[in-house]
């Protein structure tokens, strides 16, 4: 328990920076989408309601394992790209944040029903911890460059533990997100738009 408190204390700034990047570009995606969609605001919801007789639970369910695997692959790319000074990591998170913000700007009701149930776990949890992990790797890399020694950069007893714990948190959040997205989100979507 002491380690967990220390982890959040040691890495608070990196977690907040990661969260800020995600949220700023999420809102940019939502605002730009809202402006671009114009009078077609809410069109997806209208189309879903019009075709509600043909929507079944099996039509909108997705295998939790395939969702988890896909999201894990993307977030592992973000995490590992910390080796490249987190530049690629930040670009991927920005792209994902804009992409996930866009549906909220173009059709808030549809996005609230189909994305919001798993949003916290997949994006606020998974993506934020993936980017935090990338920043921790970059921080380790910069320390190694400054000290001109990998061994000396590992002298802090928490460096590798923090990276590993961040990875574990990311995986846990993505696993919960996949379960919610696979089993809960389709039920909510069906209740909102189905029979």
Kindly give the residue locations of the regions a language model identified.
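Terminal transmembrane helical module of multi-pass membrane proteins
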Residues: 138-195
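Transmembrane alpha-helix/helix-exit interface in multi-pass inner-membrane proteins
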Residues: 31-38, 79-106
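Hydrophobic alpha-helical membrane-insertion segments
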Residues: 21-34, 121-128, 170-173
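Interfacial helix-start motif at the membrane-water boundary
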Residues: 54-85
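Alpha-helical transmembrane segments of helical membrane proteins, especially in multi-pass transport
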Residues: 117-140, 166-169
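N-terminal signal-anchor transmembrane alpha helix
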Residues: 8-41
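Cytosolic juxtamembrane amphipathic/interface segments immediately preceding
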Residues: 1-14, 73-74, 149-161
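Interfacial/capping segments of alpha-helical transmembrane domains
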Residues: 31-53, 188
């Amino acid at each position: 328990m002491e380690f967990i408190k220390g982890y959040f204390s040691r890495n608070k700034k990196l977690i907040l920076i990661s969260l800020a990047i995600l949220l700023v570009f999420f809102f940019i995606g939502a605002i730009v989408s809202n402006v671009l969609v114009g009078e077609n605001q809410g069109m997806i919801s209208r189309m879903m309601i019009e075709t509600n007789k043909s929507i079944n639970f099996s039509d909108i369910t997705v295998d939790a394992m395939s969702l988890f695997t896909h999201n894990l692959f993307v977030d592992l790319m973000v995490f590992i790209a910390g080796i490249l000074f987190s530049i690629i990591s930040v670009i991927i998170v920005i792209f994902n944040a804009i992409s996930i913000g866009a549906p909220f700007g173009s059709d808030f009701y549809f996005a609230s029903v189909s994305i919001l149930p798993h949003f916290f776990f997949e994006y606020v949890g998974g993506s934020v911890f993936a980017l935090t992990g990338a920043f921790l790797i970059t921080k380790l890399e910069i320390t190694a460059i400054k000290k001109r020694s990998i061994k000396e950069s590992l002298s802090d007893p928490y460096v590798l533990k923090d990276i590993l714990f961040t990875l574990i948190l990311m995986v846990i959040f993505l696993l919960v997100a996949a379960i919610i997205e696979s089993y809960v989100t389709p039920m909510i979507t069906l209740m909102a738009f189905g029979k």
